[in-house]
């Protein structure tokens, strides 16, 4: 039971930190202003890990390699700790890097789910909220192709629902492959 609690705590902390690092990569890719409250939150949460990595992996273009490497490092560390807790030292350690990549993909899909849900909530509850344009900007690149294919029904945009179903299907496939 104690191992299950430790497993849950490690998984939660790592997924929150890893998701914040991935969100930082995405914010940089979209060139969101560093003064944006979401960007300020991500930077405050992840600077302690990103800044030392930035010395080795400087920012080039739109891809924040230091944040991406930090997310991979967190996923790799999570895999090492989880395997040690579950199975001890008797492990196939060569599988750690592919497992960490699957964890990164898992976090990315859940991050997209969270962004879509928050964007939908903002659009329904308070579309004029200060953060609503930020979440619209974050979801627009993934929703735009679906919006071109799926017409609005009675004034309602169904593309977030379709994207949510697609993301859930991808998460189910990933669960079968990885875990």
Region spans (language model):
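Selective transmembrane helix interface/packing segments
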Residues: 1-179
């Amino acid at each position: 039971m104690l191992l299950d609690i430790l497993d849950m705590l490690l998984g939660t902390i790592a997924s929150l930190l890893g998701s914040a690092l991935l969100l930082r990569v995405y914010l940089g890719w979209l060139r969101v202003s560093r003064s944006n409250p979401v960007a300020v939150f991500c930077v405050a949460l992840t600077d302690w890990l990103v800044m030392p990595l930035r010395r080795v992996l400087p920012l080039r273009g739109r891809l924040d390699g230091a944040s991406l490497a930090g997310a991979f490092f967190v996923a790799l560390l999570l895999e090492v700790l989880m395997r040690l807790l579950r199975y001890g030292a008797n492990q196939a350690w060569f599988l750690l890097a592919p497992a960490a990549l699957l964890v990164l993909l898992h976090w990315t899909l859940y991050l997209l789910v969270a962004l879509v849900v928050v964007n939908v909530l903002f659009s329904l509850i308070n579309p004029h909220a200060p953060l609503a344009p930020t979440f619209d900007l974050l979801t627009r690149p993934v929703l735009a192709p679906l919006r071109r294919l799926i017409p609005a029904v009675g004034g309602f945009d169904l593309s977030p629902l379709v994207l949510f179903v697609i993301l859930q299907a991808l998460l189910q496939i990933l669960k079968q492959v990885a875990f």
